[in-house]
Amino acid sequence: SVRLGKLDVKKLTLGAPVIGEELAATLGGSLRIADGEGEAKLDLKRTDKDAEISLTASFANGTRQLGLDLLMREAKGGIIARKLGIPGQPALTLALAGTGPLDNFGATLRLSSDGSDRLSGKIQLLTSPDSDATRFVTDLSGDLAPLLPAQYRAFFGSTTALKAEGSSGGDCRFNLDTLSLESAALKVNGSAEILPGGIPKRFNLETLVELQGGAVLLPITGPETYVDRAEITLAYDQTKSDG
């Protein structure tokens, strides 16, 4: 068993070479793990600027109940916004919270900038007593354009949506049953089956880049690249491969 009754650091200082600027903060928390269950708390609060990271997590063997509450928040001009090159360096908040039995756990995710939602949705994990595989379902969407350089906003438009569903087994086999990613100029659909060891058994990926009304600038590094329409399909099936 592991037990950390109380962590209470009144002054934590990091120099500029570590994260790009000097940081002063307090750090508190606790940890208890015994017989496969436990709980953990962590709170990091800056004292020189308005920013914090807090985490509360727990799991109980008797009820198989899992709890998770993660919050990351920083005021305008914070480290994360600056490191990511977000225009205007807005205030950012990322929250991930959920509670439920281990065989049907769901969490909600929310990302906001300057108080406006940018990405939100649900992540669900499902297990079955007669299978060692864990299924996952992800459904996220939002307006990411304000977080991007102005020249790329037409590509993403006002809504970007990600949906994915699949499973991961105890034998390290990974199945991606469905993948869907859509924005104003992008549509991606795909699926894959990955064998233990990371070897693909099959995959299929269809990508369409097209913007109504004309050419669109691709959000890639290097020289500016505009396309009117691009369609790419990648497919592989081990059972049909000559190799």
Q: Model-derived features: where do they sit?
A:
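Repeated loop/turn-to-beta-strand initiation elements of outer-membrane beta-barrel proteins
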Residues: 36-41, 64-65, 103-107, 172-176, ...
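Outer-membrane beta-barrel translocator/channel fold
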Residues: 151, 217-221
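Residues that define the transmembrane beta-barrel architecture of outer-membrane proteins
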Residues: 23-25, 51, 90-92, 158-160, ...
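Elongated, acidic membrane-bridging lipid-handling scaffolds
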Residues: 1-102, 112-116, 123-131, 194-196, ...
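Short, intrinsically disordered, charge-balanced linker/junction segments flanking boundaries
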Residues: 1, 232-243
